[in-house]
UniProtKB/Swiss-Prot annotation:
Identification of the protein by name: Large ribosomal subunit protein uL14m
UniProt entry keywords in alphabetical sequence: Mitochondrion, Ribonucleoprotein, Ribosomal protein
The keyword Manganese is assigned to this record: no
Compartments where located: Mitochondrion
Native organism taxonomy: Eukaryota, Sar, Alveolata, Ciliophora, Intramacronucleata
Gene Ontology MF terms in the entry: large ribosomal subunit rRNA binding; structural constituent of ribosome
Stated family: Belongs to the universal ribosomal protein uL14 family.
Domain of life: Eukaryota
SUPFAM superfamilies: Ribosomal protein L14
InterPro entries recorded: Ribosomal_uL14 (IPR000218), Ribosomal_uL14_CS (IPR019972), Ribosomal_uL14_sf (IPR036853)
PROSITE patterns reported in the protein's UniProt record: RIBOSOMAL_L14
GO biological process, one term: translation
Organism: Tetrahymena pyriformis
Record's keyword annotation contains Mitochondrion: yes
C-alpha cells in the first residue's frame, strides 16, 4: 500500500528517476492507495538538463506494489518495487515507452487502452 511521503520509481522513459507521493486522490482522509489509483507526486531525482525539472508536481497512476495483492482466482501477486506512470493529462503517459512489468489489474479496469500499445 502507498501512503503519503512514499518514494516511488517511475517506469516511463521521461528522464525522471525518483518521485515522492504527497497527495492521494479519493477522499480527504484517505491513508492508503493501491494499484490503479491516482496520486499527486513531486519529482526528486532527474537526469541532468531534463525537460521535467526537480520539484515539479505531476499526477501519476500506481502500476506495481511491493505489498502482495490477492487476485480473483485466489492466488497472490507481488512485485519488487513500487512503480508509477507519470501522466500529462487524464490518462496519457508523459514518456513514450513503459519499461518493466505492469499489473494485470489495470487491464481489468480498462487503463491499458489509454496507454495505446505501450504496455
Amino acid at each position: 500500500m502507498i501512503q503519503k511521503e512514499t518514494n516511488l520509481k517511475p517506469i516511463d522513459k521521461c528522464g525522471v528517476w525518483s518521485v515522492r507521493a504527497f497527495h492521494l486522490y479519493g477522499g480527504s482522509f484517505r491513508n492508503q492507495s493501491t494499484i490503479s489509483n491516482f496520486l499527486k507526486v513531486s519529482v526528486k531525482k532527474t537526469r541532468a538538463n531534463n525537460w521535467v525539472p526537480k520539484k515539479t508536481k505531476l499526477k501519476a497512476i500506481i502500476v506495481t506494489l511491493k505489498k502482495e495483492l490477492k487476485k480473483i482466482d485466489g492466488s497472490y501477486i507481488k512485485f519488487r518495487t513500487n512503480n508509477v506512470v507519470l501522466l500529462k493529462k487524464r490518462l496519457t503517459p508523459k514518456g513514450k515507452i513503459l519499461m518493466g512489468p505492469v499489473s494485470s489489474n489495470l487491464r481489468r479496469k480498462r487503463f491499458l487502452t489509454s496507454f495505446c500499445g505501450s504496455i
